[in-house]
Amino acid sequence: MVPREGFLALLSVRACCFLFFLIRARQAFSQNQTCDSKDLNALLGFANELDLAKLGWVLNGSSSGCCCDWPGVTCGPPTVNGRRVVGLDLGGKSLRGSIPYSLAGLDQLKRLDLSVNYLQGVVPPQLLRLHLLEFIDLSTNQLEGVIPSNLSLPAIQVFNISYNQFTGGHPILGGSSNLTSFDLTSNDFYGPIDAGICNSSAKIRILRFSENRFYGDLPGGLKSCSSLTELWLSMNDLGGDLPDALFDMTSMTQLFLQGNQFSGDLSTNMSNLSNVVEIDLSLNRFSGFIPDVFGSLAKLESFSAQSNKLEGNLPSSLSDLQSLRVLNLNNNSFSGEINLNCTAMPKLSTLDLGSNSFSGPIPDMLPHCVQLTTLNLGNNNLTGEIPHSFKNFTSLSDLSLTGNHFSNVSSALQILQYCPKLTRLILTRNFHGGEMMPVDAIQGFRKMELLVIANCALTGSIPSWLANLTRLKVLDISWNRLSGSIPTWLGNLDDLFYLDLSNNSLSGQLPNSLTQMKSLVSGNKSPRVSSTENFPFFIKRNSSRKGLQYNQVSSFPPSLILGDNMLVGQILPGFRNLVVLHVLDLSWNNLSGNIPAELSGMTSLEILDLSHNNLTGAIPSSLTNLSFLSKFDVAYNNLVGQVPAEGQFSTFSRSDFEGNPGLCGFLSSPCESKDPLPPASRENNIVTLKENKTKSAIVSLLIGIGAGIVTIILLAVAYRVFLKSYSGSVMYC
């Protein structure tokens, strides 16, 4: 048994040894965290330029040399002089400023990520000569300048400077045999693509040059890119035929060539791309037929060739693509019947065949595409009625059948109401037989957000079943022959923010409920329609009497468009509540009374059209407070007084006020002075006034005769233009 004193002595020795071990371990750890002095100076210069103390970098004091534990800094193994910095990962840290030249002092750096910041200025050339650098990502900043054409980065594997403002010819990574990803997307590079881009980089798999200004033909040297899996060249000025070498890249999975000027026929060699998953050839000048090679593209999930000059029938092999999810051939010249076998296309979710020349009926088999959510057959020559099989669409949310020759609107709505997920429906420019909107028998459409049935010559009144569409955000039933009054319940649809009832025969007064629309009053979430990729949303571009034109967009401005009806009564002062409203169009009605000064409360208003009514009184000066007002039209009323000249009113034209003889001042006739004249001046003015009246009478007579002749000519021309344009007055793209 060990004596008590011996045990304590042994314990003390062991405790001392353990304490010594801890001290040595701490010293070793501290030494392991110490930077090489050269790297430390480079980091301190970098940190001082970009204020990196906020990230936890210790820039002074006894711990300032321990840079290897700073956030985003990676060091290599210990050396005699300390650890060397090999990685700097500061992506998405809200860094502001320019990249200092001192950063190039990190000569052992292998990885540099400064992406998604607010960096400006040029990239130090020395930084692009670091011979060990394998990964560099400067994407999504505001960097600019010219990148040297020949970079010396022998170890580089990933080079990403996308989404900046670089210019000049694209850099060439000569001698970079390990390069796998090269991304220049969304800059201002220009010139031809170098023919030898893959000569020394045979391992390159990802090449992204989209959204620049590259021009010329695709080089045949692309055949050296044998390992390429992704080729992104969209939105440039490239042209010519596609080289055969492009279709020798059998590893290709993604091919994006949209938004260029490529032309010619599509090669049958496309069948060689047996691994391709996505192809986008949209917005080019390709012509001829689509080769019937889809049977060889078993992995293809998305094929888009919209806005070209392609023609002929749909290739039969399209129906062999069980993997296909998206087919977009919009805006070409395809013809014949739509002959797709949906039973063999179980994954198809988006089918866009709009703006072609397809004819015949809608095929009954379409609902067999059980995952179809978006269907656009608009602007073709399709005929007949909506198939009863459409009741079986269980996933369909977006449907556009605009601009065809369908009949029986009642049947169409009664069938489509059974589509449980239908959210957006466009039936414009169909049903031209003067059919009546169905009054009842409609119980569905409970998820409907957007309903457009414009320019269909529909008769009757606004149907009451629309009141049940409680999720409705956009309603456009303009350019029909609807009559009766505007229902009060329209103002009770909580989500409705875009209402177009223009160019009908509606009568009565404006319902007060329109001034209480919840989506347009203060305190509500900004109104919008949820966007679906590849579905054509439409917004009114102008509402001239020559017809309506629509642009394809993803959202609508909050609007009340009630022009070209027979509405009477006064403009409601309560419109001041609609502080979210952007467009108020009450033109071409029979409204009377004054323009309410309260309209100045519509603080978001951009367009106010009150022309061609019977309004009286003065233009309220308070309207000059509408700072976003870009269009104001009160022509052809009975307004009097001085036209305001402040604010946005200084930007309006004379034509916006014409047809109001009582208006004076800015953009109109001068207002008469109210100050009395002295007696002597008054007598002289009486004589002068008589002489001027005689001269004015003669001049007015001559002007009147000339104006009358010109007016008759203009009316004749305008009438012919109106007749010509009314037949196709609503245009969708």
Model-based region annotation:
Residues M1-C733:
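Plant-biased, solvent-exposed loop and capping regions
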